[in-house]
Design a protein with these regions (language model features):
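Residues within mature, well-folded domains
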Residues: 1-77
Length: 77
C-alpha cells in the first residue's frame, strides 16, 4: 500500500499522479527507482517498480543501488 511504501522508504523525491495511477520516485546516488501504484478501491497499491542509472548513458551498479535502498529501509525502520 502507499502507506506501507511511505513507512518503509519515506516520502518520495518526486511524485506524479495520472487518473488512477501514481509514481513515487526515489533518487539515490547509485540509481533512480520508480514505484508504480494503482488505485484499488480506496487505497493505492504497489504493482511494480523499475530502476535505472541516475544519468542517461551511465551504467548502473545494481549492488550499490540495492545497498542504498537497504539504507533507506533501515533509516525508516
Amino acid at each position: 500500500s502507499i502507506d506501507g511504501l511511505g513507512a518503509s522508504l519515506g516520502l518520495p523525491d518526486f511524485e506524479r499522479r495520472d487518473a488512477d495511477v501514481m509514481i513515487w520516485q526515489y533518487r539515490l546516488a547509485a540509481c533512480v527507482t520508480d514505484f508504480y501504484l494503482y488505485l484499488n478501491g480506496d487505497d493505492y497499491v504497489v504493482t511494480g517498480w523499475a530502476w535505472r542509472p541516475p544519468f542517461v548513458g551511465q551504467s548502473m551498479d545494481e549492488e550499490r543501488c540495492e545497498q542504498q535502498i537497504g539504507n533507506l529501509l533501515d533509516a525508516n525502520a
